[in-house]
Structure formats: structure tokens, C-alpha cells
Amino acid sequence: MKLLIALFALVTAVNAQNGFGQVGQGGYGGQGGFGGFGGIGGQAGFGGQIGFTGQGGVGGQVGIGQGGVHPGQGGFAGQGSPNQYQPGYGSPVGSGHFHGTNPVESGHFHENPHEYPEHHGDHHREHHEHHGHHEHHGHHRH
């Protein structure tokens, strides 16, 4: 808990410079979308910047700050839930499932074929095979 307090203070000071710090904490920061907690706290690099990307995917998924600082961050991000309606500030880190992935828990990026090259290739091959077969069948029937 002490860490949280420390982070909060740190975030406040740093964010203040950005000019979004205060607003962020209340509006975007709260969910870590802007970088309020996750922002500095994590290294999320300023989750703000990442969350700011609007694709929270980048920041949220990257989970740099999330996993870096503490899984608890997920909790903060949760605060963003109500702010999810925000274009790119709230949803990113707040929703956590922006790309259908849980940044804090999963830890791996949604679009990272290198994570499971075999699985990815298998799936792709299967799809291709099926498609090809279907196509061939249609052609034959025609």
C-alpha cells in the first residue's frame, strides 16, 4: 500500500509537468489510461503516453508498467472502466481487453505471432487448407 501512495505522489509531481497530471489522475490517470498510476508508476512509460496512443493496445497490452510496477495496477486500470467511453484515454489500459487481451494477466501481446509460432502457423495452414479445398470443390462443381 505504501508503494501505491509513493507512486501517487510521484505521479502527481511528474504529471503536473505534463499538464495532464491533475486532470489525468481524476479523468484519465485514474485508470492509468493517461498515465496517472500506471503512468509513472510503471514505467508504462508514462502509460499516459501509451494509453494516450488511444490504442491502449499499445500501452495496455505492452503491460510495461502494469507488469513492471505491480499486478495491482490492474486494479487501478479498473478505475478506468467508467471512463471507457473515452476515445483513447480511458479504454486502453482501463478496459484491459481492448484487444481482447488482459494486459496485466496475459503479459503477451495480442498480435505477436512469435509467441506461438507453431500454433499460429498451424491455424493459418488449417484455414488455408480448408479455404483451398472449398475453392477447389466449387470450381469442380462449376
From Swiss-Prot:
Residues 1-16 form the signal peptide. Keywords: Developmental protein, Secreted, Signal. Its main location: secreted. It is found in: Secreted. Residues 125-142 have a biased composition (Basic residues). The keyword Signal applies. Residues 107-124 have a biased composition (Basic and acidic residues). One of its GO terms (cellular component) is extracellular region. GO terms for biological process: gastrulation. Residues 75-142 are annotated as: Disordered. Likely to be involved in the establishment of the head. This is Protein spalt-accessory. It comes from Drosophila melanogaster (Fruit fly). The lineage of its organism: Eukaryota, Metazoa, Ecdysozoa, Arthropoda, Hexapoda.
